[in-house]
């Protein structure tokens, strides 16, 4: 089942952390991890003006995979997570009728 989720990832301080993380996320390795969790073409990103954090709205098809990735336990992503990520929060999104 597909679920809409929101992720807020805060970066560790340091020069080039955002660029390094985004470079990995767009690499073949990063894209493989992302595709195993969510529909990449439906991802909506947003970046803080100072690049200290990034937000993603995701269409998740593998919630357990997202939890593994967000907790830093995905074996493929662990090195970049350990180097770049300070904290991650994940929320489920619900539509509101207006």
Features from the language model and the residues they span:
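Active-site-flanking beta-strand signature of metal-NTP-handling nucleotidyl enzymes
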Residues: 4-12, 55
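Hydrophobic/aromatic beta-strand elements that line small-molecule binding cavities or substrate pockets
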Residues: 9, 42-45
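Short, surface-exposed ligand-recognition loops at beta-strand->loop->(often short) alpha-helix junctions
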Residues: 10-25
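An amphipathic, aromatic/His-enriched active-site/gating alpha helix that lines ligand/cofactor pockets
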Residues: 24-43, 59-93
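Hydrophobic alpha-helical segments with strong N-terminal bias
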Residues: 46, 55-58
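Residue-level recognition of beta-strand termini and adjacent short loop/turns
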Residues: 48-50
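Short, low-order "capping/linker" segments at domain edges
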Residues: 94-98
């Amino acid at each position: 089942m597909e679920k809409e989720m929101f992720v807020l990832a805060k970066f560790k301080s340091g020069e080039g952390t955002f660029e390094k993380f985004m470079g990995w996320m767009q690499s073949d390795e990063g894209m493989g991890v992302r595709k195993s969790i969510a529909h990449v073409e439906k991802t909506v990103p947003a970046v803080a003006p100072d690049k200290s954090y990034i937000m993603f709205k995701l269409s998740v098809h593998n919630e357990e995979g997202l939890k593994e990735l967000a907790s830093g336990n995905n074996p493929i992503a662990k090195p970049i997570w350990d180097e770049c990520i300070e904290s991650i929060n994940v929320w489920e999104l619900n539509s509101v009728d207006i």
